[in-house]
Amino acid sequence: MLCHGRAADGRDPRGDGVSTVDEIRAQAREVAAGWAPPDAPQSWQLTAALFGVIAAHEALLRRLAELPSDRLPALLASAAVSFLVRRDRPMPLAGYFPEPGRPQPGFDAGFFPAARSFVSARLDDVSAICQERRYQMNEVARCAQIALGIAATASPEAPVALVDLGTGAGLGLQLDRYRYLVGTRSSGPRAAALTLSCEARGSHLPPRAGLPPITERAGIDVSPIDLEDGAARAWLQACAPPEASALARLDAAVKTARLHPVNVIPGDVVDVLPGVLDSFPAGREVIVTDAYLAVFLPPERRARLVGILAAAGRGRRVTWLSLDPLVPLGPSGRDSVQGLALPAQLVRDYQRHGVFAALGARTFDHGTESGRLLARAHPSGQWIEWLSPDAA
């Protein structure tokens, strides 16, 4: 989600592909801070507290420092702990974690000693899970933000092909099958199994999330999730924030995806993308989306990604929508990972607080290119603040 310890261009400064204990501690602390703003709902306390425990557990941090940095060690550890707690139900710790279909349990200071003791006692198990698995963040609430980006950039009424990079279980490819409530506006199928609510902040209203017809859809992921596999679904659940509402969203989205299977191609997104784009009908408009993926690509791979999109955009309209956590922005950074100029106030706000993302769009349209920063957004889809066109 949020990472420190990288150079301003995103490179690992040591070049060894791993993070130090201090870097992982900073990652965990930053995630904890992101879930503990002054206006945070009570249901966020557990997530913030869990990452606080991870940040303070020296033995766990040393184990995590053995992992490649692209495995997102702090996030992976939180999922491993959640997985074991949900599977084994150790008390009293399990009493703090929500169960599907039930209300959010209460939270108190007893969580901290219970969690510390559990991590210490099960350190080998937590470490083994982190060695074996990858973190899969399928926060379907982000679809509300992505849908607004599509509504703002796609050609009205024209059919589009949708490609989701790092799609995991492919839940983001179902976004036209969800209903949205953004501020006081609603859109999407009335009979949808899932309604996603997103607070609209600021003085500029985002567009209504009316989506064009999606005629083709494909996802790419290095480790796709088979939703027909119960063990895979259990891991996906462990990667969700430990909130009753997040589990309910995930359950509804998984049911929707199982009813409407999509094509998810295994492999590196940069290697696989050209073939996917070539598979669509000639001239078909394409929307390519990613949420927290491009930031973790090495700079040369990001440049290759842009080159692929630009090449495809010589004969069709291709729009790349990205939710970017603005990492690694650094103290002197002024551009997003997409290469879009950031408003000075947004940079200052990020450097002070660092708990929001940027939604940006780059469009390659028959040889011409344009780009625009659309909004700032909560990392897990809770709110969006649309920016005016002259915000920069």
Describe the predicted segments one by one:
Residues 273-281:
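Short amphipathic alpha-helix with an adjacent loop that forms part of the alpha/beta core around
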Residues 231-234, 238-248, 266, 312-392:
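Domain-level detector for long C-terminal conserved domains
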Residues 12-125, 129-136, 140-146, 160:
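A short N-terminal interaction module
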Residues 67-69, 87-90, 94-121, 132, ...:
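Class I S-adenosyl-L-methionine-dependent methyltransferase module
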Residues 267-271:
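Conserved SAM/SAH-binding loop
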Residues 297-307:
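A short, conserved alpha-helix within the catalytic core of class I
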Residues 1-17:
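N-terminal amphipathic/basic-hydrophobic helices that include classical n-h-c signal peptides
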Residues 286-299:
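A short SAM/SAH-binding and catalytic strip from SAM-dependent methyltransferases
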